[in-house]
């Protein structure tokens, strides 16, 4: 059996950070593993039915290193559903599953749980953010998994217990310390950000944009892959703020600022405007922006460069600077997806789809022109090959640990540099 060889490969990947001299051996192991694991047609069909992880829910290092594939509503995933005491059950469900079906699966699990001696009555499904905000789903809601925020979790409880739901402890507490990012080069991190963005973005079909804009939340067919791209944008923004605010050393914070500005520049150079603007907006987070001593330690060259980046992110005059940049670039490129959706939504809501019984073709052409950029981007293949020497960075970039509670981020900021400093 070739299973032990794969296990050896995974162990070697985990040891790369401590033993970089293993790079060539890991490369050979990877090649042999790929050869031995080359699937037959029957195996390929079977893999389509396997349970697949969302990118924020990786549990094993080999899962996060696999290339991303487009999600369909029929795909199955594992998901944790928590109870008010923070115990949880793990369910296996289709992505398009209705909330009523999810609750039925949860009830079945709780029935055999030792932690639940009494079977609960009427259950509801709730999304709880790290800030404690709650959103109750309707039994008819579908495909709720991809709508969750970065650190949002699913809870189930009886209606009378709704107000008792609290975020998980790990979402409201933080531990200061040095980041793994200090040991990684800006080039490696930027390259892996771009690679992952391309994998996610290439999974999005143009129809998902049309569905998102024309149907919104009322659509029975959710734009699953597009929602994951939007989540990734939010995740990268909060990652930047989290890394800087967890760093207790002033000189190291300055180093992180320099590194993030360099990462943004490299993403822009590779025409990944999604991560480029996400990093810039992360540095513009009020909790980071107020760190006067940290920003004063930044060399003038980097401050000037960041000011140029800020001007591109400036929303004034209908994002003119960003639009000028887009016009100057040639595909393939990854646009800043939230702004693209904003443009499509504005065009849809400001123009009627029909004039009497006639279709407004002018509106359709304008919508087509906006989505044409996506089509061209998908047509051109990107050279995104990576070597095993970057596997640790690759795993890190695909499993970002972030704090998305703005109040907590601001408290961390004030502890680093109190208001009177």
Functional labels for PLM-detected ranges:
Residues 129, 280, 350:
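A broadly conserved detector of short glycine/acidic/proline-rich loop/turn motifs that flank catalytic sites
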Residues 2-72, 104, 295-421:
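Intrinsically disordered, proline- and charge-rich regulatory regions
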């Amino acid at each position: 059996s070739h299973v032990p060889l794969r296990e050896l490969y995974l162990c070697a990947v985990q040891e790369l950070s401590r033993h970089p001299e293993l790079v060539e051996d890991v490369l050979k192991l990877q090649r042999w593993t790929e050869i031995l694991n080359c699937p037959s047609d029957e195996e390929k069909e079977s893999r389509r039915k396997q349970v697949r992880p969302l990118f924020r829910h990786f549990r094993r290092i080999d899962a996060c290193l696999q290339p991303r594939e487009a999600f369909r509503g029929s795909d199955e995933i594992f998901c944790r559903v928590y109870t008010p005491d923070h115990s949880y059950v793990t369910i296996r469900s289709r992505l398009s599953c209705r909330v009523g079906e999810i609750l039925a699966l949860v009830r079945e699990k709780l029935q055999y749980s030792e932690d639940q001696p009494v079977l609960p009555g009427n259950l509801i499904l709730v999304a709880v953010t790290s800030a404690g905000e709650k959103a109750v789903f309707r039994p008819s809601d579908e495909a709720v998994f991809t709508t969750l925020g970065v650190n949002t979790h699913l809870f189930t409880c009886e209606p009378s217990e709704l107000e008792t739901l609290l975020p998980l402890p790990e979402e409201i507490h933080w531990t200061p310390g040095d980041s793994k990012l200090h040991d990684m080069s800006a080039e490696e991190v930027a390259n892996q950000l771009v690679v992952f963005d391309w994998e996610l973005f290439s999974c999005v079909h143009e129809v998902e944009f049309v569905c998102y804009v024309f149907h919104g939340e009322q659509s029975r067919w959710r734009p699953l892959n597009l929602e994951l791209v939007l989540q990734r944008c939010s995740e990268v923004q909060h990652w930047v703020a989290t890394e800087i605010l967890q760093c207790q050393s002033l000189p190291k914070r300055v180093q992180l600022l320099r590194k993030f500005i360099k990462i943004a520049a490299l993403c822009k150079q590779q025409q990944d405007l999604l991560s480029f603007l996400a990093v810039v907006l992360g540095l513009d987070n009020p909790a980071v922006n107020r760190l006067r001593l940290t920003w004063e330690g930044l060399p003038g060259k980097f401050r000037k460069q960041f000011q140029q980046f800020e001007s591109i992110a400036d929303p004034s005059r209908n994002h003119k600077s960003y639009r000028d940049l887009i016009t100057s670039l040639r595909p393939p490129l990854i646009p800043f997806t939230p702004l693209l959706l904003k443009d499509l939504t504005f065009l849809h809501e400001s123009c009627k789809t029909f004039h009497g019984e006639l279709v407004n073709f002018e509106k359709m052409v304008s919508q087509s022109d906006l989505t044409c950029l996506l089509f061209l981007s998908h047509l051109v293949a990107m050279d995104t090959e990576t070597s095993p020497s970057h596997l640790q960075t690759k795993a890190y970039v695909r499993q970002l640990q972030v704090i998305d509670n703005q109040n907590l981020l601001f408290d961390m900021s004030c502890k680093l540099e109190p208001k009177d400093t």
